[in-house]
Curated annotation (Swiss-Prot):
Pfam families, per the entry: FGGY_C, FGGY_N
Protein residues bound to ATP: 13-15, 267, 310, 314, 411
Keyword Amino-acid biosynthesis among record annotations: no
Family membership: Belongs to the FGGY kinase family.
GO molecular-function term, one example from the UniProt record: ATP binding
GO biological process, one term: glycerol catabolic process
Protein name (database record): Glycerol kinase
UniProt activity-regulation remark: Inhibited by fructose 1,6-bisphosphate (FBP).
Gene designation per UniProt: glpK
GO terms for cellular component: cytosol
Originating organism: Xanthomonas campestris pv. campestris (strain ATCC 33913 / DSM 3586 / NCPPB 528 / LMG 568 / P 25)
List of residues binding ADP: 13, 17, 267, 310, 411, 415
Signal peptide location: none
Enzyme kind, highest EC tier: transferase
Amino acid sequence: MEKKYVLAIDQGTTSSRAMLFDRQGKVAGVAQREFGQIFPQPGWVEHNPREIMTSVYTTITELLNNAQIDAREISGIGITNQRETAVVWDKATGQPIYNAIVWQSRQTKDICTQLKEAGHEQMVRDKTGLLIDAYFSGTKVKWILDHVDGARERARKGELAFGTIDSWLIWNLTGGKVHVTDYTNASRTMMYNIHTLEWDAELLEMLDVPAQMLPEVRSSSEVYGMTQTQYFYGEQVPIAGIAGDQQAALFGQACFEPGMAKNTYGTGCFMLMNTGDKAVASKAGLLTTIAWGIDGKVEYALEGAIFVAGSVVQWLRDGLRMFGKASDSQAYAERAGDNDGVYFVPAFVGLGAPYWRSDIRGAVFGLTRGTSKEHFVRAAVESMAYQTRDVLTAMQSDSGIELKELRADGGAIANDFMAQFQSDILNVPVLRPEVAETTALGAAYLAGLATGFWSSREEIAKQWAVDRRFEPNMPEERREQLYAGWQQAVEATMGFRIS
């Protein structure tokens, strides 16, 4: 039977999706299922790994039924996933020994403080390209081994397996036959040396994590194994692509050349710039990470993570009840005319790149009796664009590359006002693609390259198409005046303390 589709499994923080893509890279079907969030203590976020698997199985079944697709028409499966989230399970039973600790969770911050006080920061930075932070997987694994009775000893005996979500999905889909991850996910664990491309003995010793529990690290595009027959009506389908969500979006945006960059505007913002075969060490508060490993070659990226972006609009809607639906924010922002000197620094969980300050709170500046709801909404929407400029400034400083255009994706980029303001404040064109689902598309492309569904990156690059191009049209004096106000607001926010 002719292979007509590639299936992407996009396992996210709040939901799992299964998506079919045809040879033109267009969406041919989608199914989505949300799952529960677990908050055992303030600042802790966990998931039930079994519930994640159930959501994935359900979306696959729904997709095949709704699209009336024969499993034999699927060339391969690409997996993309919420990064850093850590699962530890029993190899014999396949049962998790604890919940998955989610990337957002701050429950390992005390471990991070101890590691910093012990003087490990520079070593971690040099080997992994990361900072010591509760965000990354390494301290999460250590926490589980520290807090589950007998876990570390069992791990040393080879009885337990660790994996990021991609590893967990593949283990289950293959019936426990395959324990792998790819370069992109390994590079987010704080245990992987991104230069030597191996699990690092010094990092493992620092965290007291036994090497026996770690997955094999493979390329981002190859056949890792076959699914068990029960998931695809008696058929086996090759699992052939893996990438963490942000790297998958970079690939889905066809940012294949050094200096090309994308920004994903979701709950937070994640901006990645391709730096080719150079692992550029950041001096400006960014992360150095692996973009992907394909064709026997690893390529790198600089990454800036902004913790609060689209979620500020959700907060205005749900917390302050300023409007009924998120899309209303565009009309409110446009009605305001300008920001009237109001700046909103949405540091609800601190500030991410390039500041990395988890100890500060959000703030609003410049309020007068004349400040309206519209000004407030506009300032909140503008904050996404200002934070992106902070990251881009750091990227250009680190890489020595001046950005020619920014490829944008994610829910918030549907807001035309935000997209235009972003272009204005960066003084760079912002391109919104025709296919908005770039994360799932990137995973599909990686799988399709491995199975021969697509022939090359050149073929993929030709498929990438612009929905709308936003050109900068703000006078330079006004642009710099607005950005200077933002910088003052950030500085004031960082100086504010609650005793």
